[in-house]
Amino acid sequence: MKKVSPSYLKHQFLIAMPHMHDENFAQTLTYVVEHNANGAMGLVINRPQSLTLADVLEQLRPELPAPKRCQEIAIHSGGPVQTDRGFVLHPSGQTFQATVNLPGGISLSTSQDVLFSIADGYGPDQNVITLGYAGWDAGQLDAEMADNAWLTCSFDPAILFDVDSEQRLDAAARRLGINLNLISTQAGHA
């Protein structure tokens, strides 16, 4: 009998299906940072909060005023897990105290120095900053996929870095040739 290796979704986008009722994930686009036999981790990339980088810097280094440009850099709600922890997706090249290189020429940094670098004008110009992440236990994301909770879309750095946050979900769906407004809110199997 032929052994089939599991199909993992690392470095792909997850598009929440219209029937997704979990408010943490309804109408979201999630970048899958890791997916293996032990579970999965992703970052929701289309939910900007009312917080900006200026607000975060006020907490991290209150002795220094945040540069004006930091008021324009959105902080996204990356998911419901560890919502006080920051994650920054950015193109590979620069490394910080805690940087992991991911496929496709992007990196994930989790140390404060990446935020200071962005604020001070010498960090990665292209970035998505989130607080929190989405986490799935072993087999949980696989089960949600089998239940038609998500569509997958191949990663496109333009969607991550060049498309406005609020347009990313539709941009990923268009990449698949889909209009999410035309998909039924009822799920099923044929």
UniProtKB/Swiss-Prot annotation:
GO cellular component: cytosol
Pfam families from the UniProt entry: DUF179
Origin superkingdom: Bacteria
Transmembrane segments: none
NCBIfam families in alphabetical order: PRK00228.1-1
Record-stated family: Belongs to the UPF0301 (AlgH) family.
Xref: HAMAP family: UPF0301
Name of this chain's protein: UPF0301 protein PSPPH_0476
Organism, as annotated: Pseudomonas savastanoi pv. phaseolicola (strain 1448A / Race 6) (Pseudomonas syringae pv. phaseolicola (strain 1448A / Race 6))
